């Protein structure tokens, strides 16, 4: 055991003229010399490295206990102590003294310090002596499999005052000082929610923090992350994306209404539709259970476990689709279904599904293809809004937009007049175009720019971790840029709700999809939508001669959007590898009576 004189000699000889960092304040200081060798404890003067007046004097006294040295200031009461470490001084062995203490009497205040930040330790946690703050930080990081990045050179100051500035360096310091990751238990969940998301600690809750100002939606400043320990890859969003969507001083609207209030009463709220599809999925599951209860139980188990999504995809049964359908429905908060009973009741009298055997030439009927009630496009975002944008919030928001688009199509009598088979075929063929138009229409309320920036950040992260090939990354990046370019161009055109409704109708009634029946009838509906669109533009924008042409020229860009990539970006984190095409028939096969039955659930 080195004596205090030897330690002092090491300090003076090895660090003379060197700059060291005070761990409590992060101040850069320099050891100058030693004073008064006759004192009971060695005294050292520490000055700022710029040569300014010496600010602190420390006393180093050796304790009788091996491996412990007391550091104190002669002018303080041991509360605001300055300390530093040498190879013989470990932070976990430092204890603080007041000036009038002596080695014989023992210190007035004796307590261990956190090995990570130097704060007062509360005990040994996960294998190291730490404070409560570092204990909680380490537990959250390991349980949720969070990963961070350092904006500096990975040697940031971690002390009591600066420990929250760099989470990457703080976590690395926790591990370096002996905190064991395998000592952290998975979070326990209540019994009543055991059927929810798997208790796997690494299940889609990892975070990427992006400091984001929504007032400038295209200028995100991301903090990129790395996760060398993650081996599971279920898609682009498997790492989870978290973006701060609550900047101070920015008003965030959770609902957008594209037309006047008079149209709102004619549009059923999305939460009612959620109740309908939840009920339908439950009926489907009950039917499957009567045929094979064991198989259905396994399907439910797999669908609730992120680690089994690949197996979930391979099963390809009706129960699989119903379960994915149920998952989408749950994302739409079915508990709010009673809010719009009157809206659905109003629709029931005007919308009638016509089977494929019916032959009705709807073009001979009087009245427009679209009315004011078909212009309303009210998107309600998930509530409460989280502080950080995550993969489930993105999936829930996208699911609401998807169901709202399907709900809008069902409200058009001409669409229902085509019959069930044709309706399903049309939506399967063009749901991606309708969804993309919805993204542009709800650009602000969904914070689409922030979501797209999140996707880009995740691509960079996946490339750094070699989770994705360069070709795959290029394909995804091109799709994201196409989305951004399309939405930006639509926003710049200041398109109103009527124009969006007619654009969607023109897309929906496209007769060029193979396998469609009554193609002539579908083409007539499209022509009727175009004529009404032209009349509206002429009356509303008489001075803008080329507005109609500019809007129609944006539609070909929709065909460049890959539906499979859209599914991976927006829905895979919610329903795994289930295709949207498999979910669409469940939505469109609902009878009008089911709306009223489930609206009171």
From Swiss-Prot:
Q: Which CDD domains match?
A: NR_DBD_TR2_like, NR_LBD_TR2_like
Q: Which PROSITE patterns match?
A: NR_LBD (PS51843), NUCLEAR_REC_DBD_1 (PS00031), NUCLEAR_REC_DBD_2 (PS51030)
Domain of life where this protein originates: Eukaryota
Task: Give start and end of each NR LBD domain.
Answer: 349-591
UniProt keywords (A-Z) are: Activator, DNA-binding, Isopeptide bond, Metal-binding, Nucleus, Phosphoprotein, Receptor, Repressor, Transcription, Transcription regulation, Ubl conjugation, Zinc, Zinc-finger
Residues with Phosphothreonine modification: 221, 223
Q: How is it modified after translation?
A: Sumoylation requires both PIAS1 and UBE2I. Sumoylation appears to dissociate NR2C1 from the PML nuclear bodies. Enhances the interaction with NRIP1 but inhibits interaction with KAT2B. In proliferating cells, stimulation by all-trans retinoic acid, activation of MAPK1-mediated phosphorylation and recruitment to PML bodies with subsequent sumoylation, suppresses OCT4 expression.
- Record-listed cross-link Glycyl lysine isopeptide (Lys-Gly) (interchain with G-Cter in SUMO), residues: 251
List the GO molecular function terms.
Answer: DNA-binding transcription factor activity; sequence-specific DNA binding; zinc ion binding
Extract the Gene3D superfamilies matched here. Erythroid Transcription Factor GATA-1, subunit A, Retinoid X Receptor
As annotated, the DNA-binding region falls at: 111-186
What residue intervals correspond to the zinc fingers (NR C4-type)?
114-134, 150-169
Name its cellular compartments: Nucleus; Nucleus, PML body
PANTHER family membership: NUCLEAR HORMONE RECEPTOR
On subunit structure and binding partners, the annotation says: Homodimer. Heterodimer; with NR2C2 which is required for chromatin remodeling and for binding to promoter regions such as globin DR1 repeats. Interacts with ESR1; the interaction prevents homodimerization of ESR1 and suppresses its transcriptional activity and cell growth. Interacts with NRIP1 (via its LXXLL motifs); the interaction provides corepressor activity. Interacts with HDAC3 (via the DNA-binding domain); the interaction recruits phosphorylated NR2C1 to PML bodies for sumoylation. Interacts with HDAC4 (via the DNA-binding domain).
Function of the protein: Orphan nuclear receptor. Binds the IR7 element in the promoter of its own gene in an autoregulatory negative feedback mechanism. Primarily repressor of a broad range of genes including ESR1 and RARB. Together with NR2C2, forms the core of the DRED (direct repeat erythroid-definitive) complex that represses embryonic and fetal globin transcription. Binds to hormone response elements (HREs) consisting of two 5'-AGGTCA-3' half site direct repeat consensus sequences. Also activator of OCT4 gene expression.
So what family is this one in?
A: Belongs to the nuclear hormone receptor family. NR2 subfamily.
Name of the molecule in the record: Nuclear receptor subfamily 2 group C member 1
